[in-house]
A protein has these predicted regions:
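Residue-level recognition of alpha-helix boundary/capping or hinge positions
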Residues: 17, 108, 137-138
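Short, low-complexity, Pro/Ser/Thr/Gly-rich segments in the mature regions of secreted, periplasmic
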Residues: 130-139
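His/acidic/aromatic-lined binding-pocket segments of jelly-roll/cupin-type domains
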Residues: 48-50
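Sec-dependent bacterial lipoprotein signal peptides
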Residues: 1-17
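A short glycine-rich beta-turn/N-cap micro-motif
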Residues: 31, 53-57
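Short, exposed beta-strand-loop hairpins at the edges of beta-sheets
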Residues: 114-130
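Contiguous, well-ordered beta-strand patches that form the walls/edges
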Residues: 36-43, 56-119
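N-terminal helix-cap/turn-to-beta initiation motif at the start of protein domains
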Residues: 17-32
Length: 139
Protein backbone atom coordinates (compact mmCIF):
# COMPACT_ATOMS: atom_id res chain seq x y z
CA UNK A 1 0.00 0.00 0.00
CA UNK A 2 2.88 2.36 0.79
CA UNK A 3 4.36 1.75 -2.67
CA UNK A 4 1.07 2.56 -4.37
CA UNK A 5 0.67 5.73 -2.31
CA UNK A 6 4.22 6.78 -3.14
CA UNK A 7 3.69 6.16 -6.85
CA UNK A 8 0.43 8.12 -6.85
CA UNK A 9 2.09 11.03 -5.02
CA UNK A 10 4.97 11.03 -7.51
CA UNK A 11 2.56 11.05 -10.46
CA UNK A 12 0.53 13.91 -8.97
CA UNK A 13 3.67 15.91 -8.21
CA UNK A 14 4.94 15.42 -11.76
CA UNK A 15 1.54 16.33 -13.24
CA UNK A 16 1.52 19.53 -11.19
CA UNK A 17 4.73 20.70 -12.86
CA UNK A 18 3.70 22.55 -15.96
CA UNK A 19 5.73 24.78 -18.21
CA UNK A 20 5.09 28.49 -18.35
CA UNK A 21 2.54 29.20 -21.04
CA UNK A 22 3.23 32.66 -22.42
CA UNK A 23 0.50 34.28 -24.44
CA UNK A 24 1.41 37.41 -26.41
CA UNK A 25 -1.59 39.20 -24.91
CA UNK A 26 -0.24 38.63 -21.38
CA UNK A 27 2.81 40.76 -22.09
CA UNK A 28 0.86 43.77 -23.38
CA UNK A 29 1.12 46.94 -21.33
CA UNK A 30 3.83 48.85 -19.51
CA UNK A 31 6.55 47.18 -17.44
CA UNK A 32 9.13 48.95 -15.25
CA UNK A 33 12.38 47.26 -14.26
CA UNK A 34 12.39 46.54 -10.53
CA UNK A 35 15.35 45.09 -8.67
CA UNK A 36 14.13 45.65 -5.10
CA UNK A 37 14.34 41.88 -4.54
CA UNK A 38 18.05 42.02 -5.45
CA UNK A 39 19.63 44.39 -2.89
CA UNK A 40 23.15 43.66 -4.13
CA UNK A 41 22.30 45.28 -7.49
CA UNK A 42 22.30 49.09 -7.55
CA UNK A 43 21.39 50.34 -11.03
CA UNK A 44 22.36 53.81 -12.22
CA UNK A 45 19.13 54.09 -14.16
CA UNK A 46 16.44 51.87 -15.53
CA UNK A 47 14.17 50.80 -18.36
CA UNK A 48 10.45 50.94 -19.05
CA UNK A 49 8.97 48.71 -21.76
CA UNK A 50 5.51 49.29 -23.25
CA UNK A 51 4.45 46.29 -25.35
CA UNK A 52 1.84 47.18 -27.97
CA UNK A 53 -0.62 44.86 -29.73
CA UNK A 54 0.83 45.78 -33.15
CA UNK A 55 4.12 44.00 -32.38
CA UNK A 56 6.06 47.11 -31.39
CA UNK A 57 7.59 47.90 -28.03
CA UNK A 58 8.39 51.42 -26.84
CA UNK A 59 11.44 51.44 -24.58
CA UNK A 60 12.36 54.34 -22.33
CA UNK A 61 15.90 54.23 -20.93
CA UNK A 62 16.76 56.52 -18.03
CA UNK A 63 20.30 56.92 -16.81
CA UNK A 64 21.64 59.25 -14.13
CA UNK A 65 24.79 59.99 -16.12
CA UNK A 66 23.84 59.65 -19.80
CA UNK A 67 20.30 61.04 -19.59
CA UNK A 68 17.06 59.65 -20.99
CA UNK A 69 16.30 58.34 -24.46
CA UNK A 70 13.49 56.46 -26.18
CA UNK A 71 13.51 53.81 -28.89
CA UNK A 72 10.88 51.73 -30.61
CA UNK A 73 11.60 48.13 -31.55
CA UNK A 74 9.58 45.19 -32.79
CA UNK A 75 9.02 42.01 -30.81
CA UNK A 76 7.58 38.55 -31.00
CA UNK A 77 6.88 35.85 -28.42
CA UNK A 78 7.14 32.19 -29.32
CA UNK A 79 9.48 29.26 -29.83
CA UNK A 80 12.93 29.38 -31.41
CA UNK A 81 15.56 26.77 -32.20
CA UNK A 82 18.22 26.94 -29.50
CA UNK A 83 21.52 25.17 -29.04
CA UNK A 84 19.81 22.47 -26.98
CA UNK A 85 16.66 22.12 -29.05
CA UNK A 86 13.49 24.19 -29.13
CA UNK A 87 13.20 26.99 -26.60
CA UNK A 88 9.59 27.91 -25.82
CA UNK A 89 8.32 31.17 -24.31
CA UNK A 90 11.04 33.29 -25.89
CA UNK A 91 10.79 37.05 -26.30
CA UNK A 92 12.69 38.30 -29.35
CA UNK A 93 13.34 42.01 -29.76
CA UNK A 94 13.89 42.97 -33.42
CA UNK A 95 13.50 39.36 -34.65
CA UNK A 96 13.66 40.47 -38.29
CA UNK A 97 17.35 41.42 -38.07
CA UNK A 98 19.10 39.29 -40.69
CA UNK A 99 22.40 39.36 -38.80
CA UNK A 100 20.73 38.03 -35.62
CA UNK A 101 21.74 41.13 -33.69
CA UNK A 102 18.31 41.29 -32.10
CA UNK A 103 17.96 40.39 -28.43
CA UNK A 104 16.49 37.08 -27.28
CA UNK A 105 15.23 36.37 -23.77
CA UNK A 106 13.59 33.34 -22.17
CA UNK A 107 10.54 34.51 -20.21
CA UNK A 108 11.02 32.68 -16.92
CA UNK A 109 8.16 34.32 -15.02
CA UNK A 110 5.03 36.14 -16.14
CA UNK A 111 2.16 37.03 -13.82
CA UNK A 112 -0.32 39.90 -13.87
CA UNK A 113 2.12 42.04 -11.89
CA UNK A 114 5.60 40.57 -12.43
CA UNK A 115 7.82 39.42 -15.30
CA UNK A 116 11.38 38.03 -15.46
CA UNK A 117 13.64 37.41 -18.46
CA UNK A 118 16.90 35.51 -18.86
CA UNK A 119 19.03 36.27 -21.93
CA UNK A 120 19.26 33.21 -24.19
CA UNK A 121 22.48 31.28 -23.70
CA UNK A 122 23.16 32.66 -20.20
CA UNK A 123 22.53 31.48 -16.65
CA UNK A 124 21.43 33.49 -13.62
CA UNK A 125 24.29 34.94 -11.59
CA UNK A 126 24.44 37.93 -9.27
CA UNK A 127 26.72 39.76 -11.70
CA UNK A 128 24.29 39.42 -14.60
CA UNK A 129 21.28 41.06 -12.93
CA UNK A 130 20.27 44.04 -15.06
CA UNK A 131 21.88 42.84 -18.30
CA UNK A 132 21.35 39.09 -18.80
CA UNK A 133 18.62 38.78 -16.14
CA UNK A 134 15.80 41.34 -16.01
CA UNK A 135 13.00 41.69 -13.47
CA UNK A 136 9.92 43.88 -14.07
CA UNK A 137 6.73 44.91 -12.35
CA UNK A 138 3.64 46.10 -14.20
CA UNK A 139 3.16 49.85 -14.12
Amino acid sequence: MKKISLIIMAILAFAGCSKLEVNKENILGTWVDDYSAYPYYAPEGGETYTFNADGTVDIHYYDVFAGDHDVQRTYTVGAVEGTSGMENDVLLLDPHMSDYSGDGFKIVKLTKTEMEWQRLGTTFQKGTVGSDFKHFRRK
